[in-house]
């Protein structure tokens, strides 16, 4: 895997997981 390939994808993935965790905490 190339970390410098698309950092935006990694950031979006982290944000997605973070939002999912927040959603589970809320619900």
From Swiss-Prot:
In developing fruit, and to a lesser extent in vegetative tissues. This is Uncharacterized protein RJ21. It comes from Fragaria ananassa.
């Amino acid at each position: 895997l190339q970390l410098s390939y698309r950092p935006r994808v990694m950031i979006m993935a982290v944000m997605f997981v973070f939002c999912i965790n927040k959603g589970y905490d809320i619900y």
